[in-house]
Amino acid sequence: MAKIPVTVLSGYLGSGKTTLLNHILQNREGRRIAVIVNDMSEVNIDKDLVADGGGLSRTDEKLVELSNGCICCTLRDDLLKEVERLVKKGGIDQIVIESTGISEPVPVAQTFSYIDDELGIDLTAICRLDTMVTVVDANRFVHDINSEDLLMDRDQSVDETDERSIADLLIDRDQSVDETDERSIADLLIDQVEFCDVLIINKIDLISEEELAKLEKVLSALQPTAKIIKTINSEVDLKEVLNTQRFDFEKASESAGWIKELESGGHASHTPETEEYGISSFVYKRRLPFHAKRFNDWLETMPNNVVRSKGIVWLAQYNHVACLLSQAGSSCNIHPVTYWVASMSEAQQTQILAERQDVAAEWDPEYGDRHTQFVIIGTDLDEEKLTKELDACLVNAQEIDADWQQFEDPYQWQIRPAR
């Protein structure tokens, strides 16, 4: 039996995912499509729009509604079971899953990439994840990426000047977010853009040609491998989103612009066209630690033209752990992720260095594997100025021999030493 191709639609609230889904259903040209729709509202307006707006019965399109939560969180098991049921029942050529506007795409992709031993379900044997589509609202992306709003704080009230469709506005008003969800809108947008192989810039009629050109270059810097398609009302040739055979989990996991920059040491392809619009990136790399207080102060006053920064940071006050810096627009987070090999026992170091040539090749006689390396992506970046500001946050010559644990610490993390 041929594996059924699966397309996943992601995108923030109001971007046009439901419009795209309706477009797919209305132009299916004989394709037998099973649709899995999920939103986080008590009244599934997305579902009603698909069923009624598309003029299609649930029987015809095998519309499946998972109404108890997000498909990539609380309903992961239901999604597995529902997809298995649909495929085994037969009579379909394609599955399309519309994620809720507050969903991250990676967990959905993982559902189709691994065997679930607990449930005894192996979706990899009966279907294949074919295309990960992310829809971006051209008119709101820049505003939302620079917003400091958390998902749970975003006001869903309707503004008379809001140019989104009535359908999208209704969806937005009815989507609900868990009160404990502390994700920012900027973080979610970046997650959705960085993990896709088709990126649809929708509502291009609401911005100027110059704004569109710049937005396209920003998105290309964030996700350099995805195919970018510009649309009005999410109208796209279905061959670009169905049965494209584009998706590869390993490649998708490594396709984000910040990863490409780090892998190339800051020498990824920077096209003249991109630089014409002021879009650039560079890698900051040092073998000295940051003074945590000074670095934190810099993060809090980071220029707003820095769109994305991500990578590993070495903080003097936490000399035994590597920290992950992840910044998206106005949202910034830093936290410990793993122990430096240099902080482990001599026996552990010997074993790891024997097994990991990449670690051994970068080993410093004094500091071991400790280092800072992160990428900065933005518009009209002054690399020299930013580099000087960051260098000023490093432990200086007068501090290098001091007791780093006595430095002012803004984080106050409680972390046990490596064993």
Residue ranges of predicted features:
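C-terminal accessory "lid"/substrate-recognition subdomains
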Residues: 2, 42, 141-142, 147-373, ...
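Nucleotide-state-sensitive switch-loop elements of NTP-binding domains
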Residues: 2-182, 186
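His/Asp/Glu-rich metal/cofactor-coordinating catalytic motifs and the adjacent surface-exposed loops
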Residues: 379
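Edge beta-strands of jelly-roll/beta-sandwich modules across compartments, strongly enriched
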Residues: 386-388
